[in-house]
Amino acid sequence: MATTADFRNGMCLEIEGQYYFIVEFLHVKPGKGPAFVRTKLKNVATGRILDKTWNSGVKVEEVRIERRPYQYLYQDEMGYNFMHPETFEQITIPGASIDGVQFLKDGDMVEAMVHATSETVLTCELPPHVKLRVTYTEPGLKGDTATNTLKPATVETGAEVRVPLFIQEGELIEVDTRDGSYIGRVKE
């Protein structure tokens, strides 16, 4: 059991038989009345975000999870398939429970969150930054560098990323998987 004082981002809770990850939390101490904690929780099964307010000091059921490395293999109608690099065990995770799934490409390593006691896979986490090749983008106009203008670019996974005007087709770029933003060019 954990209390609201133990809350941290990424913590897994069991609420009414469902598993939730804490996305955000904020301790609020109003001038009048008792303190409370506002949280944004992500349902592991559906991927939906739930806003929940807790009275300060309330006890909640914390779920112990283990992080294990897995390699992405392929996608089918059941979800995304991964393999453990040492045991060659294969697992399938539904796409709704994976953040940044549009940046996942064959062979990428992810961290799977596994329930410590029941050994069920809850979700997986992509690395915060990935390197992707630009497959399509409009050509930038020469000399148009006065402003910080961005243009759409399609990367090798099919996702669309906003990039600066100087980025051309075939270039390797680094993308933040959490918000899909362009980080920079990668030297080859």
Swiss-Prot record:
Give the CC-aspect GO terms.
cytoplasm
Read off the HAMAP family from this record: EF_P (MF_00141)
This chain's function reads: Involved in peptide bond synthesis. Stimulates efficient translation and peptide-bond synthesis on native or reconstituted 70S ribosomes in vitro. Probably functions indirectly by altering the affinity of the ribosome for aminoacyl-tRNA, thus increasing their reactivity as acceptors for peptidyl transferase.
- Which pathway or pathways does this protein act in? Protein biosynthesis; polypeptide chain elongation
Please tell me whether the keyword Zinc is annotated for this protein: no
- Record bears the keyword DNA-binding: no
Q: What protein name does the entry list?
A: Elongation factor P 1
UniProt lists the gene as efp1
PROSITE patterns of this UniProt entry?
A: EFP
Coiled coil ranges (UniProt) are none
- Check the record and name the Pfam families matching this protein: EFP, EFP_N, Elong-fact-P_C
Which keywords describe this protein according to UniProt?
Cytoplasm, Elongation factor, Protein biosynthesis
Q: Which GO terms describe its molecular function?
A: translation elongation factor activity
CDD domains reported for this sequence: S1_EF-P_repeat_1 (cd04470), S1_EF-P_repeat_2 (cd05794)
Q: What is the lineage of its organism?
A: Bacteria, Pseudomonadati, Bacteroidota, Bacteroidia, Bacteroidales
Q: Where does the protein end up?
A: Cytoplasm
Q: Which GO terms describe its biological process?
A: peptide biosynthetic process
> To which protein family does this belong?
Belongs to the elongation factor P family.
